[in-house]
């Protein structure tokens, strides 16, 4: 599974500036999911790869990022 890492409180994606390989996104994806997850900056948000099927990713139901 793949997807944007999401803030559970406000429903927003984790923003990033440096597109492509990005240490911040990789670190956040691994902290949220597990150490074998991958992560990079895509469309100015952190995209996580190699996730388990039950992983919660953006968009969250009933949460609108403001």
UniProtKB/Swiss-Prot annotation:
PROSITE patterns: LCN_CSAB. Expressed by the venom gland. The keyword Secreted applies. Keywords: Disulfide bond, Ion channel impairing toxin, Neurotoxin, Secreted, Toxin, Voltage-gated sodium channel impairing toxin. The keyword NAD does not apply. GO terms for molecular function: sodium channel inhibitor activity; toxin activity. GO terms for cellular component: extracellular space. InterPro entries: LCN-type_CS_alpha_beta_dom (IPR044062), Scorpion_toxin-like (IPR003614), Scorpion_toxin-like_sf (IPR036574), Scorpion_toxinL (IPR018218). It is found in: Secreted. Disulfide bonds join 12-65, 16-41, 25-46, 29-48. GO terms for biological process: defense response; envenomation resulting in negative regulation of voltage-gated sodium channel activity in another organism. Residues 1-66 form the LCN-type CS-alpha/beta domain. CDD domains: neurotoxins_LC_scorpion. Its main location: secreted. It comes from the Eukaryota. Has the structural arrangement of an alpha-helix connected to antiparallel beta-sheets by disulfide bonds (CS-alpha/beta). Belongs to the long (4 C-C) scorpion toxin superfamily. Sodium channel inhibitor family. Beta subfamily. Beta toxins bind voltage-independently at site-4 of sodium channels (Nav) and reduces peak current and shifts the voltage of activation toward more negative potentials thereby affecting sodium channel activation and promoting spontaneous and repetitive firing. Has an inhibitory effect on voltage-gated sodium channels hNav1.1/SCN1A, hNav1.2/SCN2A, hNav1.4/SCN4A and hNav1.6/SCN8A. Reduces the peak current of hNav1.5/SCN5A but does not shift its voltage of activation. Also affects the inactivation processes of hNav1.1/SCN1A, hNav1.4/SCN4A, hNav1.5/SCN5A and hNav1.6/SCN8A. This is Beta-toxin Cb3. It comes from Centruroides baergi.
């Amino acid at each position: 599974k793949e997807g944007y890492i999401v803030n559970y409180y406000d429903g927003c994606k984790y923003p990033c500036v440096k597109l492509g390989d990005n240490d911040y996104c990789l670190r956040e994806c691994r902290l949220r999911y597990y150490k074998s997850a991958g992560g990079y900056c895509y469309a100015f948000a952190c995209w996580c790869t190699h996730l388990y099927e039950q992983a919660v990713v953006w968009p969250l139901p009933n949460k609108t990022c403001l």
